[in-house]
């Protein structure tokens, strides 16, 4: 299977017109980050004076930034700065994903953009949800950061039943990379996640090099409903307060 077909198999983008207007919460602005020639990633930046910390957030697979606003924007109310972008070909982002390294390179550019905003590495918490956990974990091995949070991660593409070994161009093997991660790490998974069962987190957790690691499995939690659970917020707050 060629890389174009592999890409189409894995990714589920929904485009938005360039003139699409988001209904943005207070203190949130729309941004574009140029990552390559004629490739600009659309994103949102939430600025607050309540904390110096930045959650550098990498989204899941399906849909686009509107999905973040509809289903995950509660993190904007947690008192932290937040930077989140769409992937190439998602939402209002231009270009197309054409390989795993392409995604990692974009993640590094987003990190560099955070530095340009004035954040120091020790201010940055790398935060990935679902597919975004691969980018967050990758950055944890390449860039300095305060901590890493992986919500509903997958250990590798090959370990996801619906993909198996059909997309060798996309390994996205966080479990294999975990032995290079040395910063404090929190994994959170839903007990009843029917997209990515908790054993994905267990494999990553077992391989982490850092000894400052925690894993929370939320009772009766699913794949996309964890942030609204009190157990999630308690685990998140405890982890941050101990950094």
Language-model features and meaning:
Residues 71, 174, 183, 197-206:
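Short alpha-helix in the alpha/beta-hydrolase fold that links the catalytic acid
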Residues 192-196, 223-224:
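Acidic catalytic loop of the alpha/beta-hydrolase fold
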Residues 202-224:
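Catalytic histidine neighborhood in serine/cysteine hydrolases
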Residues 75-94:
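Conserved alpha/beta-hydrolase
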Residues 180-182, 187-193:
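Short beta-strand/loop motif that positions the catalytic acidic residue
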Residues 97-118, 176:
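Alpha/beta-hydrolase active-site loop
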Residues 61-74, 96:
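The serine-hydrolase catalytic nucleophile loop
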Residues 1-34:
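An N-terminal hydrophobic leader/cap segment in hydrolases
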């Amino acid at each position: 299977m060629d890389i174009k077909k592999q890409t189409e198999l894995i990714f589920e983008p929904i485009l938005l017109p360039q003139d699409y207007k988001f209904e943005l919460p207070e203190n949130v602005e729309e941004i574009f980050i140029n990552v390559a020639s004629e490739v600009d990633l659309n994103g949102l930046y939430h600025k607050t004076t309540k904390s110096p910390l930045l959650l550098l957030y990498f989204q899941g697979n399906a849909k686009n930034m509107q999905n973040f606003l509809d289903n995950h924007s509660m993190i904007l109310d947690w008192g932290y700065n937040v930077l989140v972008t769409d992937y190439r070909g998602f939402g209002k982002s231009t270009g197309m994903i054409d390989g795993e390294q392409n995604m990692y390179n974009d993640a590094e550019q987003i990190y560099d953009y955070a530095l340009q905003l004035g954040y120091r590495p020790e201010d940055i918490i790398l935060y990935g949800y679902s597919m975004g956990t691969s980018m967050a974990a990758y950055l944890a091995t390449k860039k300095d950061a305060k901590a890493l949070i992986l919500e509903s991660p997958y250990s590798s593409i090959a370990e996801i039943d619906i993909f198996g070994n059909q997309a060798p161009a996309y390994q996205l093997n966080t479990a294999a990379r975990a032995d290079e991660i040395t910063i404090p790490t929190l994994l959170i998974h839903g007990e009843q996640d029917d997209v990515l069962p908790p054993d994905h987190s267990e494999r990553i957790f077992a391989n982490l090099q850092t000894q400052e690691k925690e894993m929370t499995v939320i009772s009766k939690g699913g794949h996309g409903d964890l942030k609204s659970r009190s157990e999630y917020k308690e685990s998140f707050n405890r982890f941050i307060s101990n950094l």
